[in-house]
UniProtKB/Swiss-Prot annotation:
This is Glutamyl-tRNA reductase. The gene is hemA. Its EC number is 1.2.1.70. GO terms for molecular function: glutamyl-tRNA reductase activity; NADP binding. The record marks H99 as: Important for activity.
Length: 435
């Protein structure tokens, strides 16, 4: 068995490819079920964010397992495998383990050290367990990866001042507005006519950062207006006007800066829609949804500038140099966690031998105890029998302690296999085919 990962990210694929493979929360269960239907995939889990889709699997054969996952991705996205493959990466065993831990720590993020990815890995673990698609191996890997992410953030300054996708989007708006006014740097958003479409987690973060950059009034649109109203209640210091999506066109005409972050699977703002709206001023769209909420063709309009998540690199590169230095320290911590996981997994090789040894010794204990008790006669009380029973169990546990500890201790594969063979031979644990 081997652990593999197949996926794509902002490093390997542009947003127009990533959005075709984005798996929304409501489709995760069915996708996990489809992946588990492949006979060579024993355990599987899916990580789907705006910047990456990664599928982790415990497979019988690494090459067959990777091919199966690629086949699933092609079927799901309706993109031919030959077209898709150049954008995919795959890692096996040690590299796959290290990759997940680096992802969890924020070391592979567009925004180095961003914190949201850790909660996304936690959700990945929860969904795998709820759908019973993960087992002891992936559950342990995911749990240890979460621990690695927490450790990096606790023991280094990697996350200090780290921007998120949402804060990078707000900074991009500041930069572009500044450039329009001949200013090289970040400008206040006070006075900007801001529209936020969507009322989920990303929109909450957007409003938080908009507030910190001077925005004191905005319009919030959502399909479910009650959700928008509930979100606005968390920001009493900002004037937030809540509306339904049916007022999108009118709201756009009253805005100078529009952020979109919804779970829509298709763009709902395109050039045709914009042409039917009477725009009176220049307008900036910043779309952080994946799949994208805004069609690329809106850029053809003379009054519109449109940006998506791939355009955030301009902001991210401004403050990456400092965290790149800290990332080296963080990566050493992650590699330590990888070693701990791999040693644990290697120790599982000893479990069948340990279980057989325990089983054989328990059988001997029971047989010899029964012989002894039968010689004691009826005068031997039930309480005394319990004492003797506990005594014999304690002796067996004492005998097993040293060999079991040795078999489970960190050692090379060759050393462990040699130890296992010695134990099997000394205690006659081998079956007839092995002898």
């Amino acid at each position: 068995m081997q652990i593999v990962v197949v996926g794509l990210s902002h490093r390997t694929a542009p947003v127009e490819v990533r959005e075709k493979l984005s798996i929304p929360d409501q489709a995760i269960s069915e996708s996990l079920k489809s992946l588990r239907a492949y006979s060579d995939i024993l355990e599987v889990s899916i990580l789907s964010t705006c910047n990456r889709l990664e599928i982790y699997g415990l497979v019988k054969d690494k090459n067959i397992g990777i091919s199966s996952i690629k086949e699933f991705l092609s079927d799901y996205s309706q993109v031919n495998c030959e077209v898709l493959t150049p954008h995919l990466f795959d890692f096996r065993q040690e590299e796959a383990v290290l990759h997940l831990m680096k992802v969890s720590a924020g070391l592979d993020s567009l925004v180095l050290g961003e914190g949201q990815i850790l909660s996304q890995v936690k959700k990945m673990m929860r969904l795998g367990q709820e759908n019973q698609s993960t087992g002891p191996i992936l559950n342990r890997l995911l749990s240890q990866s979460v621990s690695a992410g927490k450790k990096v953030r606790a023991e280094t300054n990697l996350g200090t001042g780290a921007v998120s996708i949402s804060s990078a989007a707000v900074e991009l708006a500041q930069l572009k507005i500044g450039q329009d006014n001949g200013i090289d740097g970040l400008v206040s958003l006070k006075g900007e006519k801001v529209l936020v479409v969507g009322a989920g987690r990303m929109s909450r973060l957007l409003i938080t950062h908009l507030k910190s950059k001077g925005c004191n009034k905005l319009t919030l649109l959502n399909r479910n207006i009650d959700r928008a109203i509930n979100l606005s209640g968390d920001f009493p210091d900002i004037e937030i006007i809540c509306k339904g999506l049916d007022e999108l066109d009118k709201s756009i005409t009253l805005s100078s800066l529009v952020f979109t972050s919804t779970a829509s699977e298709k763009p709902f703002i395109d050039l045709e829609r914009i042409k039917n709206i009477s725009l009176n001023n220049k307008l900036k769209f910043i779309d952080i949804g994946v799949p994208r909420n805004i069609s690329n063709d809106v850029k053809q309009h003379d009054l519109i500038e449109a940006f998506d998540v791939d355009d955030l690199e301009e902001v991210v590169s401004r403050n990456q140099e400092f965290r790149q230095k800290i990332a080296k320290e963080a990566e050493s911590l992650v590699k330590e966690e990888r070693i701990i996981f791999l040693e644990w997994w290697a120790s599982l090789e000893a479990v069948p031998v340990i279980n057989k040894l325990r089983s054989d010794l328990e059988l001997i204990r029971k047989e010899e105890l029964q012989k002894a008790l039968s010689r004691m006669g009826p005068d031997f009380s039930a309480r005394e029998r319990k004492v003797v029973e506990a005594l014999t169990k304690g002796i067996i546990n004492k005998i097993l302690h040293t060999p079991v500890t040795k078999l489970r201790s960190p050692q090379s594969r060759e050393e462990r296999q040699a130890s296992l063979k010695i134990v099997e031979k000394l205690f006659s644990l081998m079956d007839d085919e092995q002898k």
